[in-house]
Amino acid sequence: MKNIPGLRYLAILAMVCCFFLNFMIYREYGASLQAKPEGTAQVAQKAEPEAAVPPSNGELRRPAEYRGIYLHNYSARMPKILADYVTKAKQHGVNTLVLDMQDAVYFRPGEIPQQNVALCLSNGIWPVARIVVFPYGLKEYPVPQSLIADRMALARKAVSLGFREIQFDYIRFEDSGRLRQVGQEERYRMVEGFLSNARRELSAKGIVVSADVFGRVALNRHDPIGQRLEGLDNAVDVILPMAYPSHYTWSRFMIANPYYTLYKSSVVARDRLKKAQLVMYIQGFEMRVAPSGLSLPVYIAHQMQACVDARIGGWIVWNAAQNYGPTWDALKLMAAKSPIPGIEAARAATAREERSAESQATGTRTPATKKRTEGNRA
């Protein structure tokens, strides 16, 4: 009986922890679950409908120009939440939803109801299943075959649910200098081999295969993470560089000029690819937006317009917190008859930067070129 006070303490602590956990879950998801969005797309009334035959592709084809947003696994699993995004997507001209097949913390599979994928298809929305291959990059080599088998099993599961595209992310080596014993060409062979094998199997079922790559891979060659555009061009149908301006920390100019960053990355990558469709992931979050002097909606719209001007295969907005209010506002700016605020100045700055780069390449440096070069040293 001497342990009773201790047991009471543990019981009270457990109750407090449970209360806190429930509070956090409600704060994160409760409002969206209780509120019925205006104009929500129709969803099945049954909570757990019987499994149906996966919907056929019908007339829905891979978009010639992707206009998409990313949704994490929780949003993808909840019918009411997903229906709200489908409704907003249709209202604003979004034709693609990238849905996580795994949770974002432990990368464990999270079951997406088949009816949710069918909802996308029936509303003309292209559903893409995102699968993280090597969380935060490959840390051991050779690659465990059990891991490869697990990822391919998840891809097959996505196909059975009706997904029309499998998007592999984190298909790279860790960006930390580990595994130095693995040579550059071997890294390429591993990454491209996995994707080629996946495509060989999935394309036989009419499934599109895509891969996310670092934004810098669009601009460089011989990247140690094992990604190169020329090799991936033969391994997948769609390549998606994650060209978030906030991540180009070596260039103040690229951080402060989202139009230039996306336009430059898009044009260089476009000219290097011969087969694969090029789609850019663009930044839909606040990180390092301030140096641009733009509001977030305008910042996003500049990136969208850069993709249009570069004549590539579209864009997908990334916001891990699912805060897409600024993205909807950006799309309103894109649809408006009046020019996007600051877009002409951004185009002019891009043209000047391109001329400066040409001057550097030919060795004819001007004072303006020298100033810009020094400004790029972050």
Predicted regions and their residues:
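Substrate-binding cleft of secreted/luminal carbohydrate-active enzymes
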Residues: 243-244, 258-259, 276-353
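Boundary/entry segment of secreted carbohydrate-active catalytic domains
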Residues: 31-89, 211, 283-285
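Active-site-adjacent "subsite" loops/lids of carbohydrate-active enzymes
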Residues: 61-70, 74-79, 112-122, 126-161, ...
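Aromatic-lined carbohydrate-recognition surfaces of secreted/lumenal glycan-active proteins
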Residues: 70, 128-135, 188-226, 273-286
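Active-site groove signature of glycoside hydrolases
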Residues: 98, 151-185, 316
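Aromatic- and acid-rich polysaccharide-binding/catalytic face
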Residues: 99, 225-259, 318-323
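Catalytic domains of carbohydrate-active enzymes, especially glycoside hydrolases
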Residues: 81-105, 160-166, 238, 307-315
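Aromatic-lined substrate-binding rim segments of carbohydrate-active enzymes
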Residues: 96-133, 176-209
